[in-house]
């Protein structure tokens, strides 16, 4: 059995920043993640996706953000337990005991749940033969955008992923059709402004008021996408790639059985320190819910800092935290994290 100060569930960007924050406060960390590598959705779903709202980075690829966060956390020697899930929780006095799907046992004073969307998968559009085209012409995630160079692409959706990828791929695609059932997009206003600016050229055509209706092609190769409006008028879009971005299915898995207050696949927390209804267990990032919550990586970073400062007295048996700015602290030499 391992003994540590903090167990962090989730090795996405918010979980990795929590490792750094814990280290700055002198807390030892173990990190559990179901994926084979650290990085969460940033690595498994969209490593090349540009992120625009990280301070000091006008634009940074998701993969590069994870690389920098891992470097930032490395001096504190976190131990990563990858390709396994946290499945059982037992409370013993002032400690928690966590068991993973690989029978790893970890004893900890504090738990930080930074599991993002939990177990995730794409929300697929209800098209009869879509499986015939998946992985060759239909993709739900992008990990190598170069494969779309010179293609005619239909992107479906109106949120950040749909809009950001339309902008990003417009540099290399032959033609992009962005299909959305409404006239208004829910992406960041600046992204929508960029989208509409590019749409003034022939690179992106906005198909609003329409939804996906059917796919046409042969041998898993898409030839066209049929879209339909509310009056059942159809339009045929010549395309060889479909990218549906309708969000992710969320599943908390075993976390839902831990006695936490859960609402609509999110964990309810207080809005001051992001503690759950169980003292010593915190939830941060996209998995956490409170009034006024913003689902931003930046917000998750702030939640990590607040929750771990609050957890300090629990880890160190009631000792008061003497606050210091990071410029007064010595994080030590760079070292390598350990993966179990």
Curated annotation (Swiss-Prot):
Its EC number is 1.18.1.2. It comes from the Bacteria. The keyword Translocase does not apply. Its cofactor is FAD. InterPro entries: FAD/NAD-bd_sf (IPR036188), FAD/NAD-binding_dom (IPR023753), Fd--NADP_Rdtase_type_2 (IPR022890), Ferredoxin-NADP_redctase_2 (IPR050097). Gene3D superfamilies: FAD/NAD(P)-binding domain (3.50.50.60). It is an enzyme of class 1 (oxidoreductase). It catalyses: 2 reduced [2Fe-2S]-[ferredoxin] + NADP(+) + H(+) = 2 oxidized [2Fe-2S]-[ferredoxin] + NADPH. Keywords: FAD, Flavoprotein, NADP, Oxidoreductase. FAD binds at residues 33, 41, 46, 86, 120, 286, 327. Binds 1 FAD per subunit. One of its GO terms (molecular function) is ferredoxin-NADP+ reductase activity. SUPFAM superfamilies: FAD/NAD(P)-binding domain. Homodimer. Belongs to the ferredoxin--NADP reductase type 2 family. This is Ferredoxin--NADP reductase.
